[in-house]
UniProtKB/Swiss-Prot annotation:
Family: Belongs to the conotoxin C superfamily. Consomatin family.
Covalent S-S links between cysteines: 65-70
4-hydroxyproline modifications at: 71-72, 74
Domain notes: The cysteine framework is C-C.
Name of this chain's protein: Consomatin Mao1
Modified residues (D-tryptophan): 67
Presence of keyword Signal: yes
Purpose of the protein: Moderately activates human somatostatin receptors (SSTR) with a preferential activation of SSTR1 and SSTR4. In vivo, does not cause behavioral changes in mice within a few minutes of intracranial injection, but causes a progressive loss of movement thereafter. Four to five hours after injection, mice recover, even with the highest dose tested. Shows antinociception and antihyperalgesia activities in two mouse models of acute pain, most probably by acting outside the central nervous system.
Tissues where this protein is expressed: Expressed by the venom duct.
Molecular function as annotated in GO: toxin activity
Propeptide feature: residues: 23-57, 75-82
Amino acid sequence: MQTASWVMVMMMVWITAPLSEGGKLNDVIRGLVPDDVTPQLILRSLFFHRPSDSVVRSTVPVHICYWKVCPPSPWRRPNGKG
């Protein structure tokens, strides 16, 4: 919880610091997003997938669990217990 609070404070400072130097909010927000990310690119990536994406998804096992009961597989211990 402390880490989340710290991250929130840092994000607020990161956004508001340029504003105190005379920047406009819209310019600050645009500065947080890479230039090559556009709504068209986002929509295209949602609807059109490369064939390799579906092959990768079909070979990776999907773990559907609650966080406290079954953490994601990369974080599981080698002995298979919790």
